Design a protein with these regions (language model features):
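A hydrophobic alpha-helical transmembrane-helix feature that marks the membrane cores
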Residues: 1-174
Length: 174
């Protein structure tokens, strides 16, 4: 697949724009209506960013990615709702696992590793984000003070978990 310079330029604009919007949601004390507006704008920008997947993957792979992520989300939601309170250490462990995954993916971009390594990393991502769903569910249900009534940030946590699950399931199915 050949990607034009214009597409690459737009990709980076949407990529950094989505990170900026995400930081606005996470690190500001905007009123709920303003956070909701930023969340909707973030969803739009992320949709534009993911439009590249329509060119990269077949419709069946995308559908299977969505359905697979929905199944994983449902199972891990139940696990998160049924498990006693998951402590701070679980969150720290998941953060470092996610950071390790990010570093491995960056290294993979610049290395000559094959698609098997990419699939292995996607499988690791599915595991990590599946556990994040359980952890986020546990925080929402068992510790309402964690979000201090900020349902937009709680929704953003779920949204990012789902997006990452879909992406990783699509990479494994491809």
């Amino acid at each position: 697949m050949r990607i034009s310079f214009h597409t690459i330029k737009n990709y980076w604009l949407y990529f950094f724009g989505s990170i900026g919007l995400l930081l606005v949601i996470a690190w500001t004390n905007l009123p709920y209506w303003a956070k909701f507006f930023v969340f909707v704008l973030f969803s739009y920008v992320l949709g534009r960013l993911f439009a590249v997947y329509k060119k990269k993957y077949s419709e069946d792979v995308i559908r299977n990615g969505i359905l697979g992520a929905m199944g994983i989300f449902a199972i891990m939601f139940v696990v998160g709702a049924l498990v006693p309170v998951l402590g701070y250490q679980v969150g720290v462990g998941l953060f470092f696992a996610l950071l390790s995954l990010l570093i491995a993916r960056i290294v993979l971009r610049f290395s000559e590793k094959g698609s098997e390594y990419k699939k292995w990393l996607s499988g690791a991502g599915i595991g990590i984000f599946g556990l994040y769903v359980a952890y986020d569910t546990n925080n929402i249900l068992k510790r309402a003070d964690y979000y201090q009534g900020d349902f937009i940030t709680a929704s953003m946590d779920y949204y990012l978990d789902i997006i990452n699950l879909v992406r990783d399931v699509m990479q494994i199915n491809n």
